[in-house]
Amino acid sequence: MARIAGVDLPNNKRLEVALTYIYGIGWSRAREICEKTGIPCTKRVGELTPDELNTLRKFIDENYKVEGDLRREVQLNIKKLKDMGCYRGIRHARGLPVRGQQTRTNARTRKGKRKTVGGTKKAKAK
């Protein structure tokens, strides 16, 4: 298994697919990396030479923010929004949708599992 940016890439996958295992690299960026390094996208990770792996590592480290650095930056951006007290920051803090989606129904992904309120039974009249 090849290791790039702290992620083990599976040997049997094509390079463009394997690169998407790295946080911060999607399909289009994986293709772009292959083109700029001159390594064919269809080549399997197990078939890569050590020189090609070093080229990939160096190119990704120099040109892109991936894995831990990217996660840290995203978390800092969210923290900055919360500290400012702006609308988006408040929505993040409350665990509600940030981009204007409705919340009267749905929004379950952001809100989490429903919390049932108990003890609301009415007493029987005699």
UniProtKB/Swiss-Prot annotation:
Alphabetical GO biological process terms: translation
Keywords: Ribonucleoprotein, Ribosomal protein, RNA-binding, rRNA-binding, tRNA-binding
PROSITE patterns: RIBOSOMAL_S13_1 (PS00646), RIBOSOMAL_S13_2 (PS50159)
One Pfam assignment: Ribosomal_S13
Domain of life: Bacteria
Annotated Gene Ontology cellular component terms: cytosol; small ribosomal subunit
GO molecular function, one term: rRNA binding
NCBIfam families named in the record: uS13_bact
Biological role stated in the UniProt entry: Located at the top of the head of the 30S subunit, it contacts several helices of the 16S rRNA. In the 70S ribosome it contacts the 23S rRNA (bridge B1a) and protein L5 of the 50S subunit (bridge B1b), connecting the 2 subunits; these bridges are implicated in subunit movement. Contacts the tRNAs in the A and P-sites.
Subunit structure and binding partners: Part of the 30S ribosomal subunit. Forms a loose heterodimer with protein S19. Forms two bridges to the 50S subunit in the 70S ribosome.
Protein name, entry field: Small ribosomal subunit protein uS13
Organism this protein belongs to: Aquifex aeolicus (strain VF5)
